[in-house]
Each structure stands twice: as C-alpha cells, then as structure tokens.
From Swiss-Prot:
Encoding gene per record: NDUFA1
Naturally occurring in which organism (per UniProt): Homo sapiens (Human)
UniProt key word Transferase: no
Family indicated by similarity: Belongs to the complex I NDUFA1 subunit family.
Tissues where this protein is expressed: Primarily expressed in heart and skeletal muscle.
The protein's name: NADH dehydrogenase [ubiquinone] 1 alpha subcomplex subunit 1
Amino acid sequence: MWFEILPGLSVMGVCLLIPGLATAYIHRFTNGGKEKRVAHFGYHWSLMERDRRISGVDRYYVSKGLENID
C-alpha cells in the first residue's frame, strides 16, 4: 500500500535535514554563539564593516549596543 513508503521517506527527509542543521550549529559554535552573516549585496557588506568598526575588537558579531557607542 501507499503507507509502505513512509519509513523510507522519513529516513530520506532526516538525512537531508542533518547537514543544514549541523552547519548552523557549527557556525554558531565557532562564532561565539552568533549566527553567521552573509553579505550578498554591497550594502550588507558595508553594514558588517560598520559593525566590525563599532565593536572595538575587530569582529562584526560582537555587539556593544546603542547605549555603549560613543
């Protein structure tokens, strides 16, 4: 019957899901708990560079917050 394909389909779905989740967790671990940002456009790149300059430690993912910016 049609339901005999469900176990194989679920195994295939899990195998396709694992690399995406693993990549997200590896990036989060290596970047100190922050998500990895990707600059697809020049404007996004300039925002990342601004965040890097503002952070004071030369890393775009370390935020100071608006109240701490001089």
